[in-house]
A protein has these predicted regions:
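Conserved N-terminal catalytic core of the sugar/cofactor nucleotidyltransferase
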Residues: 2-9, 17, 31, 35-99
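Short alpha-helical oligomerization interface
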Residues: 23-28
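Active-site micro-motifs of SAM-dependent methyltransferase domains
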Residues: 16, 106
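Conserved core of the sugar-phosphate nucleotidyltransferase
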Residues: 67, 107-136
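Canonical Radical SAM [4Fe-4S] cluster-binding loop centered on the CxxxCxxC motif
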Residues: 20
């Protein structure tokens, strides 16, 4: 069965813990190995044949200029959370949708596992999350 998957990347936040790197750009635009975090994600999606990609922006939305991507804006990003950002893209929340945070990197093989899931709802987690969380 071929699925028509969509991706929504939540990228509205500034990333206060990453200052000064995020003084003038959102955290999804911080570079790692010569590409922004969001570019790494978009490349992973495209490598898995997901081309219907939307980004919910907020802080310095003008600095996210990726072509062939649909944009939504959370005007209230400073006082809301990721759920509210997701609802900014509510009109496309039908069918099979993958939601990711704009400040993470995942490998293509992890995305492939998610795509192969037959479940109605699937979540990919890092079992070592607590170690990373405690470093915050």
């Amino acid at each position: 069965m071929v699925r028509n998957l969509k991706a929504i990347i939540l990228a509205a936040g500034q990333g206060n813990r990453l200052k000064p790197l995020t003084d003038e750009k959102p955290k999804c635009m911080v570079e790692l190995f010569g590409k922004s975090l969001i570019e790494h994600q978009i490349n992973a999606y495209k490598s898995c044949n997901i081309s219907d990609i939307s980004v919910v922006t907020g802080f310095r939305n003008d600095s996210i200029t990726i072509s062939n991507v649909r944009y939504f804006r959370n005007e209230r990003y400073q006082i809301t959370n990721m759920i509210e950002s997701l609802f900014c893209a509510e009109k496309i929340l039908d069918g099979d949708v993958i939601v990711s945070y704009g400040d993470i990197i995942f490998e293509k093989n992890v995305l492939k596992l998610l795509i192969q899931s037959d479940n109605d709802i699937s979540v990919i987690i890092d079992k070592n999350w607590k170690d990373y969380w405690s470093m915050r």
